[in-house]
Amino acid sequence: FELDLENAVDILILKVAPLGGIERSLALAKHHRLPVVVSSALESAVGIGHGIRLAGALPTLDFACGLATGQLLASDIAQIPIEGGKMRVADVTPSEAAMIELEASAERTQWWQDRVRKAWSAGADEIISEMGWHW
């Protein structure tokens, strides 16, 4: 919110997960009063579903959104149909079978846990405390 985007950008690109959720994304759009598009951050159908919900909650949406990136994944835990270039705002329910099939290996799970520990010990705990965030 601290950046003055006037005369710096023409269109605000909103990505739900990196911005902290739908409510925060909506608040940013309202604050900056710029035309917006919603794009994904190469997420599963669950994340894409949140992007679709954000797009559906915006008062105006004059540009095409970038929410079809799920097609870049070899597999996904749910399907979001695209009909005539459009996606419906709807609940996204992951397939239990797909989640079992796509479950990360023990080695990959350990890799991610180690990565989070390294980030935390590199100062994330201090930043969270300084920002007043709750973990």
Regions found by a protein language model. Name each.
Residues 1-50, 55, 74-82:
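Catalytic core of soluble alpha/beta enzymes
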Residues 41-135:
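Flexible C-terminal active-site loop/helix
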